Amino acid sequence: GIPCGESCVYIPCLTSAIGCSCKSKVCYRN
């Protein structure tokens, strides 16, 4: 539920390396 400061509209979350995932076009962590 914490925004990772990255969008995932056109590309996947690069922050997935630290546990972020794409939700509603924005990368979130927990």
Swiss-Prot record:
Entry superkingdom: Eukaryota
Pfam families (alphabetical): Cyclotide
GO biological process: defense response
UniProt cross-link Cyclopeptide (Gly-Asn), position: G1-N30
Annotated S-S bridges: C4-C20, C8-C22, C13-C27
Protein keywords: Disulfide bond, Knottin, Plant defense
Statement: the UniProt record of this protein carries the keyword Transferase: no
Annotated InterPro entries: Cyclotide, Cyclotide_bracelet_CS, Cyclotide_sf
Keyword match Signal: no
PTM statement from Swiss-Prot or TrEMBL: This is a cyclic peptide.
SUPFAM superfamilies linked: Cyclotides
Domain topic, free-text comment: The presence of a 'disulfide through disulfide knot' structurally defines this protein as a knottin.
Similarity comment: family membership: Belongs to the cyclotide family. Bracelet subfamily.
Function according to Swiss-Prot or TrEMBL: Probably participates in a plant defense mechanism.
Name recorded for this polypeptide: Cycloviolacin-H1
Source species: Viola hederacea (Australian violet)
Lineage: Eukaryota, Viridiplantae, Streptophyta, Embryophyta, Tracheophyta
